[in-house]
A protein has these predicted regions:
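C-terminal catalytic core of tyrosine-transesterase DNA break-rejoin enzymes
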Residues: 43, 47, 53-54, 137-160
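Conserved helix-loop functional segments at active or binding sites
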Residues: 24-31, 61, 94, 123-127
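Basic, Lys/Arg- and aromatic-enriched nucleic-acid-binding interface segment
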Residues: 2-52, 70, 110, 148
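Residue-level detection of the helix-turn-helix DNA-binding "recognition helix"
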Residues: 60, 119, 123, 146, ...
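A short linear hydrophobic-aromatic micro-motif
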Residues: 72-75, 129-131
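C-terminal catalytic core of Y-nucleophile DNA break-rejoin enzymes
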Residues: 11-12, 77-120, 126
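Short, polar N-cap/turn motifs at the start of nucleic acid-interacting alpha helices
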Residues: 62-69, 128-129, 149-160
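Short basic/aromatic active-site micro-motif
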Residues: 37-41, 111-112, 128-148
Length: 160
């Protein structure tokens, strides 16, 4: 029986991209359209903190504008049902604008394909880290929120 074995897991420090690495991804370009789309979807994750499934299920109904004219994403996380209120930063807005008019809000590819494309992009950008779509969430929680003065209570609420 396996019950006599104890699984010892090393605590995993989730990788995130620092500002310089994030800048490399922002500046990445390719003649291969699917890589450009993947870059944009990954950056949307970096600038909203939304997970893959939360981006996939994002609709226009999740957006609201406050009295000051700032746009917010108000959405429950699929995984935890926790309600998040996320500021729509300029980078996220420009990605939404770029893909507006499509069949879906954002052209997110299959998760496996997306992660394979991310691996290629990261390699082409000379970044030596194991990066998946989930890395974008941690990049938001660290690098992006610091650079954009996103209040800590918003970040901690979103990371639940």
């Amino acid at each position: 029986s396996l019950s006599m074995y104890k699984v010892v897991r090393e605590p995993v420090t989730p990788d995130y991209l620092d500002e310089e690495e994030l800048q490399r991804i922002i500046e990445f370009d390719s003649p291969i359209e699917r890589l450009v789309i993947t870059r944009d979807m990954f950056l949307f994750g970096c600038f909203t903190g939304l997970s893959y499934i939360d981006i996939k299920t994002l609709t226009n109904e999740h957006f609201e504008t406050d009295k000051e004219g700032r746009r917010w994403i108000k959405k429950r996380r699929v995984k935890t049902n926790v309600l998040s209120r996320i500021p729509v930063l300029p980078m996220a807005q420009s990605i939404l604008d770029k893909y507006s008019g499509g069949k879906t809000l954002l052209p997110l590819q299959d998760c496996t394909d997306t992660n394979r494309n991310i691996k290629n992009i990261v390699t082409l950008c000379g970044i030596d880290k194991k990066v998946t779509f989930h890395t974008s969430r941690h990049t938001f929680a660290t690098t992006v929120t610091l650079a954009n003065d996103v209040p800590l209570e918003i970040v901690s609420q979103m990371m639940k």
